[in-house]
Amino acid sequence: MKKLFFGSLLSLALFSCSDGGDDFTENPGDGDVNNGDGTENVEYATEETAYEIPVVFHVFYSQKSQPLEYVEEGHLPKVLDAVNRRFANCGVDLKLQFKLAEVDPDGNVMPEPGVDRQKVRIATMNSTEFLKDPAYAHYMWDQTKYLNICLFKEKNDAVLGISSFPYTLHPDTLAGMPKLMEMRPASELDYPHCVYVNSRYIYDLEPESYKTSEIVGSLCHEIAHYLGLRHAFGEDPVTYSRDCDIDTDFCDDTPTYNKAKYDQYLLSNYPYNGVFTDELVAQLAERTNSLTGEKFVSTNIMDYAVSYLNELSPQQCARIRYILMRSPYVPGPKVKRDDAPTPAPARSAGKKQPFPHRIAY
């Protein structure tokens, strides 16, 4: 989850989110994997496969007259273009691009590419409750074909976005990610497996001066969660507290730091007029590596608060590529398995594994 930092004493509590419920004990796997939907794909993924993922923005609104609900036509393509630029210039070659979906699940050409507008009675909701509620699952389009991004106003103004973590498929393993023991069609997902961003900040698009609510950084951060990345700062594996000096993102090339201590420092230096000068941004973007004591500048997309949010590391790139090539509910070709997959543990007849859904808070 990415959150907004407000310049008040009450705001410190807003940074207590965590990538809750994850298993920190798994180790990355190195095998090939099943082919996704249990059928033989025409195209198989390789390390050189370039992914172009169709995106659909589900815009939930109650009144067309409310621009923070009914996002202006033509704006979301600009947002996605900026997201593509950010990922294309993040310092590693993800071989990844996003495009607005052109057809809906029924094969109809979309009059507004990549945008699915849904009129609802109340367009202000709790995003965590939304991602857990089976009642909203039917809004999602086939996750094997589309990246679903939901937009509505969050009840909590401080929340910028949250995301579902991806799955690996038995016998594959990626540290910190939930695992499916058997493949199930996307139509059986009993919750909205998606990315969410708060539409209150949808127009904070590449502002002239620094804003912690800048939408491109928020959306890139949540998409990266969806593709298997965790926060760059330390999170306790038992309590999920950020007041810890450990490295928990499974990437040795991303420096870690104590987020709770940094938040106290940020609170005491936050501009109460909300204006960030370049000098102040440079000051507040500096962190202290909690393992080595060395100073570093926060540029990683998987950080937040005051950060440049414009880089990923080679090991983060490797995790994203692993998910792209193997995760069942991420669009695009999957790797071909040459050997017979290890059988999943036997289950009672007719009994299916509950989805081990985990949300990146």
What are these regions (language model features)?
Residues A13-S16:
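C-terminal motif of bacterial Sec signal peptides marking the signal peptidase cleavage site
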Residues P77-L80, N84, C194, C220, ...:
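Extracytoplasmic/secreted envelope proteins and their assembly/folding machinery
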